[in-house]
Amino acid sequence: MYSLGNQVKAMVITLRDGTKREFEKGITVYEIAKSISDKLAREAVGGKFNGKIVELNTKIEEDGELEILTFEDEEGKKIYWHTSSHILAQAVKRLFKDVKLAIGPAIDNGFYYDFDTERPFTTEDFEAIEEEMNKIIKEDYKLERFVLSKEEAIKFMKEKDEPYKVELIEEIPEGEEISFYKQGEFVDLCAGPHLPSTGMVKAIKLLSVAGAYWKGDEKNKMLQRIYGISFPKKSMLDEYLHMMEEAKKRDHRKLGKELDLFSIHPEGPGFPFFHPKGMIIRNILEDFWRKEHIKRGYQEIRTPIILNEELWKRSGHWDHYKENMYFTEIDGQTYAIKPMNCPGAMLVYKSTLRSYRDLPLRLCELGLVHRHELSGVLHGLMRVRSFTQDDAHLFMTPEQVEDEILGVINLVDYFYKIFGFEYHVELSTRPENSMGTDEEWELATNALISALKRANLPYKVNEGEGAFYGPKIDFHLKDSIGRTWQCGTIQLDFQMPERFELEYIGPDGEKHRPIMLHRVIYGSIERFIGILTEHFAGAFPTWLAPVQVRVLPISEKHHEYARKVYERLQEHDIRVELDDRNEKIGYKIREAQLQKIPYMLIVGDREVEEGNVSLRSRKDGDLGPISLDNFIEKILKEIATKAL
């Protein structure tokens, strides 16, 4: 415990584990970390005091809750990577004097900095920049924060000839604090927080360079964006770089082309074209989704893609989402292509008088939505402009909320286990600007927490990060190389039932407002296929594989028997191809392996004579002779059990 001798212990700090400790006012976050353990002090990168991210040198002056942040925390990574972006900018300014600075934030996987330069950067420049960055780290500059008035800040950045910084400062509302951070000779406009010094960054690497429009607007100048990553240990960097190499091999855009699953064309950027094999995977996912939902009392609906502007004004999308929507004129009126399925489901609910006996009402929809994304952020199937959301909207009474949430949690868990995904859960609570009463928020948040506890699911709390219309649970999948993907969401929504004046007749004969729960499992069918492609590296489990078996006759004289084998498999709805080309068997096997087909059935003289097949597995190689009946029994069982 932090020793105060005989001094007065003036405040109580509640730590991450719930323990309360007394400290004198003015103690820093770092000193509190050191009082807990030397190890924690060494690993600490910042703090979270009463929900606000603070620096290690921040003085605590009042009672409150404090989490010491390390690199293991998402907020800790953001602090670490934010400082790393400043190290990058300082190195670039040292080497390329005429470069102008734009912005340099921490992102989900590292950091970037945008530069305006006449000579585009190339990866050949990285060696010199990294060398300079390592010098800056070795020089161990303190990061010193200072504040200027708006007028002073503009003058300061004009003197430094940094037009992008001047533009940013001019956009800051009057009266807001304008802060800067200095490290050595380098100064940047920045709100922080940061590490205490550059020397705390132990391993840093530049990853790539790309073009990026200033403020993401295609009408603005194209800047040069350098991406990087950093870690507190070199071993962590090495592990990450290995993962990145593995990710390149698994890139769904590369595999999508090689396996003939989908394509994207300049005639429709962000609008994927699914090929026959890609459609097989898609249809399997959708059929499985439908079957499991019907089993659990859901009813499928289909709502129009284009709806009148009045609907979007009522739903709130017109005010909050208009710039991401596409519009068209019909009969002199404005219509929008739907960016979300929710308003359509509201109209279905509202189409008839509902009783409490009808609730819970579970409406599900595989709804095609369109959202305008800037061309620079489009990425294969992961970030598109047109996609299918596996939405469901559940309408219920207050008494039913917890059970309905638990039902959705169990369904999400069932789905992810089928695909072999581990996952973690995050609960996002009420933000400062929210709609709905205190009672509604308390009911909703407690119901989410209680359902998570009943499901025995550990969860992380993101205080104040819920939507303004309700708290939510997010499910983050972990793929086979350790990356996480946010897919499933359970979102309680107070806004839609209110805006659409949804009602049901209660047992008291009076009208009541239902509670609505919005949820997705896949998130987007397209993105989920992209994730699965990378998770399995294109080697889909047999039940999902577009082609499950390829029959390979050794020579032309085996074609007749091979066709009989092919037809027998077809009779059992096994997805099979016959490769009867005049090619050597070794070539045919290699090609089937490159296509990642689960099973090859090779037929030659011996197989024709004995009436069986020679089995070769994608996973286990040559498995020798097997009767066709036994193989059919084996593969049908594998498909039925959805074996991985």
UniProtKB/Swiss-Prot annotation:
Transmembrane segments: none annotated. Residues 8-70 form the TGS domain. Its EC number is 6.1.1.3. The keyword Secreted does not apply. Zn(2+) binds at residues 342, 393, 518. One of its GO terms (biological process) is threonyl-tRNA aminoacylation. This is Threonine--tRNA ligase. It comes from Caldanaerobacter subterraneus subsp. tengcongensis (strain DSM 15242 / JCM 11007 / NBRC 100824 / MB4). The gene is thrS.
